[in-house]
From Swiss-Prot:
Residues 1-19 form the signal peptide. Its EC number is 3.1.1.72. It is an enzyme of class 3 (hydrolase). InterPro entries: AB_hydrolase_fold (IPR029058), Esterase_phb (IPR010126), Plant_Biomass_Hydrol_Est (IPR050955). The lineage of its organism: Eukaryota, Fungi, Dikarya, Ascomycota, Pezizomycotina. It is found in: Secreted. The gene is axeA. Glycans are attached at residue 189. This is Acetylxylan esterase A. Optimum temperature is 49 degrees Celsius.
Amino acid sequence: MVKLQYLLSILLYAYSCTALMLDRRDPTPGQLSQVTDFGDNPTNVGFYIYVPQNLASNPAIIVAIHYCTGTAQAYYSGTPYAQYAETYGFIVIYPESPYSGTCWDVSSQSTLTHNGGGNSNSIANMVDWTINQYNADASRVYVTGTSSGAMMTNVMAATYPNLFAAGIAYAGVPAGCFYSEANVEDQWNSTCAQGQSISTPEHWAQIAQAMYSGYEGSRPKMQIYHGSADATLYPQNYYETCKQWAGVFGYNYDSPQEVQNDTPVAGWAKTIWGENLQGILADGVGHNIQIQGEEDLKWFGFTS
């Protein structure tokens, strides 16, 4: 009887070790994989990662953030970043919202504060884990997203400017525009969404800079896309977002360096304020603005 109990204890120990190893198995190259143990995850954000089979030494990282109703899988399947990863050897992080409806929390004080314990904090910890796990190049970390993911892109650029070299926001709003005075997570803000939150570049810049109080280091260069016929996040949000980053970088919002018509698509207009800020307004395009993958690669420095 004692011998049987001893054998059972060995088997149970072996089973528990195997289960632990399976739970912590490394991501499979060439497949979207979930990471469940990456350190502090205060808001239970899902962490999915694509590690290419053709992984570069000291790889770059792109954080690709999905829209409302989206998932990591949907953004992986519907965007070109994983395909590009096989060519350029970078890693793609696909966070997944923990909320019903899968919008991102861009409203609470915690997510709008550096190391505040919100969604932004969880995503930043994914970046740190990936840098350490794969010896990634910390100077080549980029962030992009669509709709709610674009809102979070602007928030990440404001709360963790030390982490990112560049950002691209497709159809978002300025960082802090959805702020909830009641400190409610994942709260919709109709005033902002409908383009009624209008302010100066200086004020928008103050809002972004307050998210990492005292920070004086470099900030990610930003590229802002929006459709002129967006009826979900009204196009005024394009202008307000460009105001925000113009204010952050010290550009004169009213005097851009250059406007390029029919760029990168016929009917679209690219406004350049300086090397750190570009805005692209897509004439007649609604909320479902198409990702410009080749242009993204240029902005992130993979191509010229």
